[in-house]
Amino acid sequence: MDLQAQLEELKTKTQEALKQLNGDHSKELQELRVAVLGKKGTLTELLKGLKDLSNDLRPVVGKQVNELRDFLTQAFEEQAKVVEAAKIQAKLDSESIDVTLPGRQMKQGYRHVLTQISEEIEDIFLGMGFQIVDGFEVEKDYYNFERMNLPKDHPARDMQDTFYITEDILLRTHTSPVQARTLDQHDFSKGPLKMISPGRVFRRDTDDATHSHQFHQIEGLVVGKSISMGDLKGTLEMIIKKMFGKERKIRLRPSYFPFTEPSVEVDVSCFKCGGKGCNVCKKTGWIEILGAGMVHPSVLEMSGVNAQEYSGFAFGLGQERIAMLRYGINDIRGFYQGDSRFSKQFK
């Protein structure tokens, strides 16, 4: 058989072999490529026969060899695409998803106990005609201290260790600045001011079971004509009874806050022993729950409110303390660790 006939036979056999490799036969395809086009392949061996051809026939057969090489190279490339597509399809078929199977269930989250406490308190005050006012966590020293009757170098500032950002900018130590800003804007010709300001506050405390560098407060303020200590006591009694039960009683003890005068600490009768004395109330029958008092005249005057005509009361309570008392939580750090198992207890 002459060289030209052998070349045609190689072309025909290679085409037939390629047709057999329609599935995932990448290994077989590579072996066939090496056998036909490799350095020791069939086409290379046939090329060696060119030297035995006449001078007239050698260029003709040489051209035929080059054309065959190009043809077979393209044929192998096209078949490689077919084999790769078959390989991908086989993988897809083996890894197909049954859409009728139930999906993976997401773990259910729970509303944080502090969120629940805050919303409960807010609902109580909304029902009493109060408005809810939000404020800035990053506050000016002027509003955080001076407007609360705490001028620079006032000794009472030592009561609150503060995170200062600059000399005049700080992380608020209470939500009272919201009250000062609201007093500045309120139009008393339209009626008294009744507001609460919930939010997060910051103190330079060392974190332990009962202290945290951040915690939550809800402070309340009522300012109008003829507001008295009796109004304060009545408001606090209503709040305590709604939160801890109708049988709860309160008592007021004299205290000191720079922004109220007179100032009181508010105790609630122990909800564990009913006032008989236990480990929760330290055998006293009473639990300290919040601080309050009549708004200091200086605080009113700094907002342009006539302290001779208007009076008011203010109070502040902590959501963490209420939650710890209500649910017997003995470590405040649990509120901030982001553990869903903790929140699940209070769903």
Curated annotation (Swiss-Prot):
Enzyme class, UniProt record, top EC level: ligase
A GO MF label: magnesium ion binding
Record flagged with keyword Ligase: yes
Principal subcellular localisation of the protein: cytoplasm
EC number, UniProt record: 6.1.1.20
Positions contributing to Mg(2+) binding: 261
Keywords: Aminoacyl-tRNA synthetase, ATP-binding, Cytoplasm, Ligase, Magnesium, Metal-binding, Nucleotide-binding, Protein biosynthesis
Subcellular location: Cytoplasm
Keyword Hydrolase: no
InterPro entries from the UniProt entry: aa-tRNA-synth_II, aa-tRNA-synth_II/BPL/LPL, Phe-tRNA-synth_IIc_asu, Phe-tRNA_ligase_II_N, Phe_tRNA_ligase_alpha1_bac, Phenylalanyl-tRNA_Synthase, tRNA-bd_arm
Taxonomic superkingdom: Bacteria
UniProt-listed GO biological process terms: phenylalanyl-tRNA aminoacylation
Cofactor (UniProt): Mg(2+)
Gene Ontology terms: cellular component: cytoplasm
Catalytic reaction equation(s): tRNA(Phe) + L-phenylalanine + ATP = L-phenylalanyl-tRNA(Phe) + AMP + diphosphate + H(+)
Cofactor note: Binds 2 magnesium ions per tetramer.
PANTHER family documented for this protein: PHENYLALANINE--TRNA LIGASE, MITOCHONDRIAL (PTHR11538:SF41), PHENYLALANYL-TRNA SYNTHETASE (PTHR11538)
Record note on quaternary structure: Tetramer of two alpha and two beta subunits.
UniProt cross-references to HAMAP family, sorted A to Z: Phe_tRNA_synth_alpha1
Name of this chain's protein: Phenylalanine--tRNA ligase alpha subunit
Organism expressing this protein natively: Streptococcus equi subsp. equi (strain 4047)
